[in-house]
Amino acid sequence: MAHPLEGIIREAYAAFGRGDVDGYLKVCTPNFVFNVPGRSAISATYHGKEGVYALAGKAMEITAGTFHEDVEDVLANNRHAVVLARHSFTRDGLAKDYRTAHVYAIQDGRLAECWEQPQDPAVFEDAWGPGL
């Protein structure tokens, strides 16, 4: 039987995919943190609502609005959740595609912190381009 958070997280990702960042944030704690590894153009630690909006804005700017996320699976329990996803977009006229895992810490039934874990860090870095 699926954990109730699995459906809630799927709905949050669907909201994000529609451009409804607040719909995603509804399942996050107020002090939510999203960690993006590496040295790419989006690599940083993003804090709170403003941080998530900054990350989404950066992703849309770099991809000229072509960013697309397919959720392949969601696993969850009362302490952790993992979203397996495939990201695809166009950057500078080139198609980019990679798989990643979003590993979440759960606090009081809400997403408290996320660590992006690309399947292949080199492909991830190439997809997003160099940071400044």
Label each residue range with its predicted role.
Residues 45, 93-96, 122-128:
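A short, polar/proline- and glycine-enriched secondary-structure boundary/capping micro-motif
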Residues 113-132:
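Low-complexity, intrinsically disordered terminal/linker segments enriched in charged
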Residues 58, 83-91:
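Short beta-strand segments that buttress and anchor functional surface loops
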Residues 1-30, 130-132:
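Short, low-complexity N-terminal intrinsically disordered segments enriched in polar/charged residues
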Residues 9-12, 24, 28, 32, ...:
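Hydrophobic pocket/interface hotspot
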Residues 6, 65-67, 95-98:
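Short solvent-exposed loop/turn micro-motifs enriched in small/polar/acidic residues
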Residues 69-74, 86-88, 99-105, 115:
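Hydrophobic/aromatic beta-strand elements that line small-molecule binding cavities or substrate pockets
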Residues 22-25, 29-79:
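A solvent-exposed, acidic/Ser-Thr-rich amphipathic alpha-helical stretch
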